[in-house]
Amino acid sequence: MKIIVSACLLGSDCKYNGKNNLNDRVIRFVAGHEVTALCPEVMAGLGIPRKCAEIRDGKMVDSDGRDMNFVYHLGVQRAIDLIERESPDLIILQSRSPTCGVRQIYDGRFTGNLISGQGFLARELIRRGYSVMDAGDV
């Protein structure tokens, strides 16, 4: 099986804070499969570390209130280009991320509150009919 996974889940230090979300359950789940890692935020050219970003009123803003919509959509498009080339059977994405969150995202006020919703990449992949799984469901 061909699986694409958020790079942070596999131990890549690509989160906004320069850390990772290494997930042993995901590592065990994908063992023995063809795995490709991706991080749409890094694919957009955003640095590590970088300002935290959340979706507010449908647009991506960073913790300084700057509009980051274009940059994040660029990363999503680059990720989709890779995904279309790879034709994966499954995509496992990082929970709560403004790009990758599948079921929940932060509320856009930088207070740590979660709301139902999807990150930019997750929403687009689901719209296109890909099989997408939240890392928390592995």
Annotate each PLM feature.
Residues L22-T36, G75-L90:
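Short amphipathic alpha-helices and their capping/turn segments at secondary-structure boundaries
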Residues M43, A53-I55, K59-L82, E86, ...:
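Divalent-metal-activated hydrolytic enzyme cores
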